Amino acid sequence: MPPRGGAIAERALRDADIVQEKDGRLYAMSGYSGLSVIDVSRRDGLRVLGTRRMYGTPVAMYLRDGVLYALFSGWRHVVPDAQGGASRREFMSRVEALDVSDPAEIQPVGSFDLPGKLTEARLAGGVLHAVTYEHGSCFGCAAAPNTTVTSLAVGDPADIAVIDQRRFIESAPSGYWGWPSVSVSDDRMYVASATWNGGEEAGRATIQVVDISDPGGALVEGARVEVTGQIASPWQVDEHDGVLRFVSLPGPWQPDARPGIQTFSIVSSQEIVPLGATELDVHPAAALRSVRFDGDRAYVIAEYADAVLTVDLSDAASPAEVGEIGGTRWINHVEPRGDRLFAFGAHNEAADGTTLHVALFDVSDLANPTMLERVDFGGRDARVVEEHDRIHEAFAFFDGLGTLAVPYSEPSSEASSWDCRTRTAGIQLIDFTRDTLAKRGAAATRGPARRVLASGERLVAVSDVGVEAFGIEDGGAPAKVADIALATLADSTVAVDDIVVRIGGASLEIAPAASPGLAEPIARLDGAALYTDAPGCQRYLGNARLFAHGQHVYVLAQTGNAAFTRLAIVDVGDPAAPRVVAQRDLPFSPGALYANPSGALVSAGDSVVQAGSTLVIRGVSDDGYYAFEEDRPPHEAWLDLLDLSDPLNPRHSSVALPDGAGHTGLQLDGTTVLVSRWTPLPDDPSRARFYLDRIDVADPSSPVVRAPVNVPGSLLAFDGASSRLLTTDYETVETPVVGREACARAFASNAAFTPAAAGDDAGPGVCRGTRRTLKLLDLGDTSAQLLDESPMDDTAAVMKALAGENRAFLSVEDAGHDGRSSILVAGGLQEGSLNTATQEVAGFDPSYGPLLLADGARLLVVDNYWPTLSVLDATDLTALSFETKSELPGYVYHVTLSGERALCSWGYGLEAVDVGP
């Protein structure tokens, strides 16, 4: 939480940071992994004592008598539909009380939900004061935008209850500008807000006072103070010795005004009397970066200014700007410590390219501050890790050690190209005395450190992904003595026997198949090992595709050159010691790994298929975005073949595919690759002839392209045992309609309206669109015979299609029924008779990137709108079964199977969901 300066929060208001240490235990909250309790009592070790998965944005944490109060915004709620339809997910704020006396068995004790976004909270005794903002459309919120202050009784964590509440309605909700800013003192809360209609009328800013001095939790509405300018940050407000003072910014309705300081006498919470005011010597265009109050002083940092302004507040009725601190550039943060001031910022002056600095100033004479010393560190384009309003929480002083720790990140100095630049994280140590600074070494950290703590002679760094401990007693560079992971980084996975290989955070990790989501893996292979000749390019691993054969994992990923794809082969025969046995760049674009046809064409294949130790990648010349269609090159297609039978010597070859105007994705039958294409008719380019091509890749060095077969439509599914083929055929039809909107609803694909009267889009006319038909064929060596067919609804837009076993699955959105979603299943290939069935999917939103995975007669459905994993069992087409197996914690990027469990990768986590019968 932002610091409150001066006398603010001096009594029983407890520290609310999301990381705390007590009695040798570290309590850390993360939006990715929830709560972790770590034993930090040993100098050379760290040990996870317990965890608790919680999904929300952590705001604050309080620890008292073995109970931890965790405060969240964005806490997920699943709300059942009153009519029995699909449930929906909503978000609120939440207070969660947890018994952490036994970290191995963290137990929920009680909870309380608050509508809106939690912006501020303070605990005093048995009372928790919480401030939420309700924007009017949030779940459970009041109709009008408002800021609500609530006092909660938390003395009995099992019975958290409202004591009192005050709601402040925004006076001009349609013109509301920005979030409210909340500042807290011992006895009062100050809720600052601004309203402006965006026009010529002047806006206004106010500070609403709320008295919170009652130890029983009663809230008393105090004065509403009109102020000049706006208060956009809690840094700007402070209460000291009965005086309210703040630095205000010009509002957007005050383009020529300057920032200023205003002071008020606090007679009582209900009576706030103006005392004094002064403008600051800052250009109107310079936004306020930060303010630090320190007793009778204030330090004001303006954006794009080269100085920190010093303000004398000893005479509250006559605040005065008295000096400035120069000799630095771009100050991010200042830390007053008596008559000394530490300033942290950035510059571009150093000859060695360093861009960050810490400076020490003597401010005993506020009118004439003097720089005593400055230490530069960090490489070019280095930057602070923490966001501005929380920078003070990462900027850590260890007075007992005389050491200052500053987390930062910088571009890798070893990047092989600009495109491969990645950022590395570290913590710079600086020794300090009253008058000196001395640069020490830097500790390299796995992730950007959010908090830094001192524990004995150790420095403990906490990031979103882990905790690391460094020895700092030798006066030189810190030495890492222990580290543990808190979050599982997983962008994609592949199962290999009894292990799971996952990629995330520019690393390749090995986890047991029994516990694939373990934060601490069996082994971790730094992504740099897959790019030894291209340093920094491991940043692209997050988009890699993974394949496995035997004890080897094949990794296909981007490089710093868009014309090449990186291949790495990793031997995981010894899960504790994975090793890269081959790596090289292949001469084709990584776009080929993901590209598939879209639009009106129904294509059920993939861009990459695997036949044992052979990978086959479909390449086309005209994939990608072109600003002008005339710039798109002529369509050509080919297959890139990777023979990986000798992992130490991977071989690449390619074979051209027969000419066509376009090609579908690839399917595989044994060692035969199937792909369909279409060619426009010479005498009628609006019509096309489709062909099925088969390429035998049993010997990838000599692929055999078999004779094409003319088939009605594009490839949807193939059954090798019966040699039967399912296609989607296309026909252009016309129908009379009234109005362009009716035409758009009549056809899902290529709908074009021609009005009977030119320009009359609402009148009668002709609608031209594409009609599609599913067709089942017997496939021979050179010809195909039609067995059965089934027309599709004209309004059914196929969003995605997959081939299963003896059936195909099509995700459909109905253009004629308000986007109703369903899954169409077409089966009967082996039987020779086409059967279809439809499963409606309530609440499913295809625009949110759903993931579909065909598994025999089942389809796994990841709905990323309200993240859930469901299974459609189409074993019996007369009795489809659709069951939601699990809610998911976040947006899922990749799903694969490991036995009877679906592995759902969502970037900062891996969820294993049982999808068995």
Task: Give the ranges of each region predicted by the language model.
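Feature marking well-ordered beta-strand scaffolds used for ligand recognition
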Residues: M1-P917
